[in-house]
């Protein structure tokens, strides 16, 4: 049973990693002036970067310093703040990525807690995972194991689908709204 639960955890990590890559790609493409189905974002700086690589290196240097090489994308609160720093928002401005993340922030935080629990075995990750399962399902799981949770049936689904399927479908749907 433990091997099957580990496979569910691995599948979730793969889906969540794809979600993070999607967020990162959309963000940097927005900074380069790429048009999405709803239009083009307006930047705080007033001008677009000429390449994705330049946008990425500039943002990383500005946020983390010249020696940093990457940013983390798992925390929706941090991604929303990042969007607000570089993309104009408010009346008359699109700020699509920020809007979608903000409107789904609590749910995305819970998904990040599931991810955090899979990759970290400490008190903080257990506490946050238990908080997520209590909010989503009204219970905690033995030893705070995400595999058991991801294999469990989602009672809010009209079909007999597991939480892993629910979360994957949600992430795909949110990504589709941003492109």
Locations of the language-model features?
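Helix-loop junctions and short alpha-helical segments
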Residues: 1-114
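Polyanionic, low-complexity intrinsically disordered segments
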Residues: 103-107, 114, 120-179
């Amino acid at each position: 049973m433990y091997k099957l639960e580990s496979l569910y955890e691995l599948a979730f990590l793969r889906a969540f990693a794809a979600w993070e890559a999607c967020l990162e790609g959309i963000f940097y493409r927005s900074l380069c002036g790429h048009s999405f189905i709803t239009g083009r974002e307006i930047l705080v700086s007033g001008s677009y970067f000429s390449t994705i690589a330049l946008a990425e290196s500039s943002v990383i240097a500005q946020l983390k310093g010249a020696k940093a090489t990457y940013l983390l994308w798992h925390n929706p609160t941090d991604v929303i703040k990042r969007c607000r720093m570089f993309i104009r928002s408010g009346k008359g401005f699109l700020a699509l990525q920020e809007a979608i993340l903000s409107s789904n922030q609590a749910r995305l935080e819970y998904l990040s807690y599931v991810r955090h629990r899979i990759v970290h075995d400490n008190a903080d990750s257990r506490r946050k995972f238990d908080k997520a399962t209590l909010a989503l399902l009204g219970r905690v799981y033995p030893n705070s194991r995400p595999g058991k949770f991801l294999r469990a049936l989602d009672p809010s689904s009209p079909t007999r689908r597991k939480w892993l399927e629910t979360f994957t479908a949600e992430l795909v749907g949110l990504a589709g709204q941003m492109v």
